[in-house]
Amino acid sequence: MNFTNAKSLLSVTAIDCWGFFAPFVANIMCCPQLEATVTVLIGQSSKHTNALALNGTVAKHCLSDVEQILMGQGASGDLRQICSISSSNLTEASCPVKHVNDFKDMVDTSKLLLACADIDPVKECCYQVCHNAILEAATAIASKGSHVLDVDASHDLPEHSIRVNDCRNIVLRWIASKLDPSHGKKVLRGLSNCNMNKGLFE
């Protein structure tokens, strides 16, 4: 994994997850920033690997390297616990699609990029244009290999919801691969802020 292009992201993440303060700003700053940084790293690496997920071994090494870099810049040493992140979060998990070519075959990538390449945080939280495009793409790739049950029935299954959520991570990584690292992080943070605000008012 090449961390050079994400050097500034890692620096910002280290500040947002600074030592003693990390647990107190976990949901507001630290964890969304950490998740965005990891998503951007995997998305950018897919340009060379054609994979939007890491295998188990590489995922362990990658997360460990990220931790070491962040700790070296003053971040908390307990980020895995604080943010409930593990190496499995860097894999495809239950999503049946992880290769870029397969992704492009199943998703209207032009529509997805148009909706998510540049979002206005306020408008996105109100109208959820990018969010809906991501959900549509995630649902599409989650359906790969599902022939036994019809789509409407499968939506009621807990396993289907988990799969769609795992595929959502794949979609976010693809989006990150199409944007420069700093702008990709901005888009991802905008989306996570909307999700957090939605949770507060539900």
Regions found by a protein language model. Give the residues of each.
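Extracellular/luminal segments of secreted precursors and ectodomains of membrane proteins
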Residues: 1-202
